[in-house]
Amino acid sequence: YMSAVYAGYGGKVPRLSKDNPDRDFGDTNIHVKGNVDIDAIGSGLQVNQRGHILVDGGGKIITHPVETSDTYSVVAEEGDVYVNAGADGKHPGTHDLVAVGNVGLINKDYGRDPNHNVEPTNIALAFTTPNSSLTGAVLNEYAESNKNPHNSGADIYLQNGATWNNEWIGMERPTPKKERPSGDNEAYLYKGSK
């Protein structure tokens, strides 16, 4: 299990610089000036801690489900990923985009290397052609936990005959400890698109 494309560990990471815990590693940026063609066991595109991935085109992001961990075509933890959606995630492009795997906005305020919670987490994916499709669910831990100080979120553009098969892929997620705002504790399926 691994990430096909990963950008992260920016900012201050004391574990990585014990001699200088105040060292700032800056941002990690990946800019793909065309389409992607990813086939991965694990995550397709992943960012954390001031990581940024921008894909000008579309392409394919195919992940294969595993039963021991979550399976994401795109996942972000205090960083941003924009595919076929412009440099700011607000301008959907015209490229074919096929993604198989969940989309995750992870509020990692736990475990080893928790995020600093000083930057937003944003994902924008533009499925704007009849040949474009998303198979997977959208998990937004910021919305689920009711902790979203930086207005983190996902913009899923679904236009011009593109399709979305909204189902969870891979390992089942446990029922949340807190009631979800919608009262739907069976499964979290993102219901909004543009």
Region spans (language model):
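Long, low-complexity, polar and repeat-rich extracellular regions
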Residues: Y1-K194
